[in-house]
Amino acid sequence: MNVKDLDFTIDLNEAQAWAKEVLQVKTSLFRWLYDPVPYIDSSLIFQPVLYNLQYNITKEDFREACGRYIDRNPKNYARTNFAFGWGEVILNTFSDACNAILSVLPPKGQVIEHIDGKPIAKENLHMIHIPIFSNDKAFSYVNGEKVF
């Protein structure tokens, strides 16, 4: 299967409505992480405004929240292209998947190259990372090679 052949289109209005519904129901599951960084406007540090929320999406519950994130610019929240609607599509595409974690990076966000935790190898699980680009300036590195 070629990931490029998969159709992960989503209606952003529906995704944001879905996210707002989940935020209202599941707010008790969120833990806000305030991490002052020099380039952050200090007036924003203690505002619990979300830019990046990971959802642990399983076949049993497509709305189980996890993770802790902050917003470095509240204006970004409304513009963020939430990927929540892709969860069911991904799980239905990979029939053996037990869960999917979807994460949206803020503008100029960066994921540091890493190897996922050791327990995963022991459980005979294989993690598949699918980068979803929301604009033509986004890119990723695969095996040290820049891809768009």
Each PLM stretch: what is its role?
Residues 101-122:
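Conserved short histidine dyad/triad with adjacent acidic residue
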Residues 1-93:
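Non-heme Fe(II)/2-oxoglutarate
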Residues 96-98, 126:
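A generic structural signal for short beta-strands and their flanking turns/coil linkers
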Residues 104, 122-138:
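Short, conserved beta-strand element in jelly-roll/cupin
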Residues 61, 100, 136:
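Long, contiguous binding/interaction regions
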Residues 90-95, 119-122, 131-132:
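Short, conserved, surface-exposed binding loops centered on an aromatic residue
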Residues 11-15, 105-108, 133-135:
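Generic structural motif
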Residues 112, 131-148:
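A short beta-strand-loop-beta hairpin characteristic of the jelly-roll/cupin
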